[in-house]
């Protein structure tokens, strides 16, 4: 008897073999995996009539084409969600549900918010794997890292490429060894701008990040300042050594924390952009402030700007539950301290800053404390699955 996964795979393959659909999909880039047949199956299987599509900025140019194809082959109506989507934390199931959508399809990010936690609306994540020619990267690694042990990381789009890279080099005749670390609940090799694995510096010679831009790369650099970092940009096909001013960042953040120690009135910003503002984390911070006898108010904001915060002159220090990198990267642009939850815990003497790195564990299952999203204290309790019992009778 075929498993459910096998049955689904068969149905998706039948949809994918539709010659008309194949022709329609030619307008999309062939090396981008938008999983349109799987999405069509999902819409049909859930009998969804009104489907929300959410894209990051780099993929929204394909939104209209994908929407047209989905409507053509399922008869559903689609709505393209136009609010800015910075990352996996911005999945906006609340808005999609409030609009009466049956299904939300989120493109370009991993399942940071599990589908079982999007109550009241069906959910589909499409990672949009991007297939690239790895021959040049393989040559670069051979040329520059003979006899070295490397860690390779990336965003979710290039995770399959990391697996190919590891298989290529982890052979008996290769002097190069490649590891793919994992920071659960992320996929092996995946890094976010706020979450990355903490590595044993004695075991590795370098980190190689596959991808463009520096936001995700800087996360693992901040978390592992002792290890040299390199970036391979698959679009420019360049391998570069990358640097980060750890001393300046540390000076700025500790300076803000020291000012916060003396503050009496705090503003807690609960981010409302998608799922950024975790209510349990906000409540944990409120409890910490209450124990220290501090005054506070809660403010809901989708995006955080100095001009907006200046409208609250009575607040001495701000703490935002949205994105740690907003404080780390842009905190000096705000006239008053703008901390994120870990830094408030430091300011209130609930934890000390590690001497050799700055934590990037905001969504890690193994985070330092209950001021992070997936700390054990904040994880949704999953119901245990009931055992599936099959009773067979012996043929006489």
UniProtKB/Swiss-Prot annotation:
[4Fe-4S] cluster binds at residues 89, 194, 323. It holds the Pfam family Diphthamide_syn. Its EC number is 2.5.1.108. GO terms for biological process: protein histidyl modification to diphthamide. Gene3D superfamilies: Diphthamide synthesis DPH1/DPH2 domain 1, Diphthamide synthesis DPH1/DPH2 domain 2, Diphthamide synthesis DPH1/DPH2 domain 3. One of its GO terms (molecular function) is 4 iron, 4 sulfur cluster binding. Its cofactor is [4Fe-4S] cluster. Residues 372-396 are annotated as: Disordered. The keyword Glycoprotein does not apply. It comes from the Eukaryota. The keyword Transmembrane does not apply. Pathway: Protein modification; peptidyl-diphthamide biosynthesis. InterPro entries: DPH1/DPH2, DPH1/DPH2_1, DPH1/DPH2_2, DPH1/DPH2_3, DPH1/DPH2_euk_archaea. Keywords: Iron, Iron-sulfur, Metal-binding, S-adenosyl-L-methionine, Transferase. Binds 1 [4Fe-4S] cluster per subunit. The cluster is coordinated with 3 cysteines and an exchangeable S-adenosyl-L-methionine. GO terms for cellular component: 2-(3-amino-3-carboxypropyl)histidine synthase complex. Signal peptide: none annotated. Coiled coil: none annotated. It catalyses: L-histidyl-[translation elongation factor 2] + S-adenosyl-L-methionine = 2-[(3S)-amino-3-carboxypropyl]-L-histidyl-[translation elongation factor 2] + S-methyl-5'-thioadenosine + H(+). Belongs to the DPH1/DPH2 family. DPH1 subfamily. Catalyzes the first step of diphthamide biosynthesis, a post-translational modification of histidine which occurs in elongation factor 2. Dph-1 and dph-2 transfer a 3-amino-3-carboxypropyl (ACP) group from S-adenosyl-L-methionine (SAM) to a histidine residue, the reaction is assisted by a reduction system comprising dph-3 and a NADH-dependent reductase. This is 2-(3-amino-3-carboxypropyl)histidine synthase subunit 1. It comes from Caenorhabditis elegans.
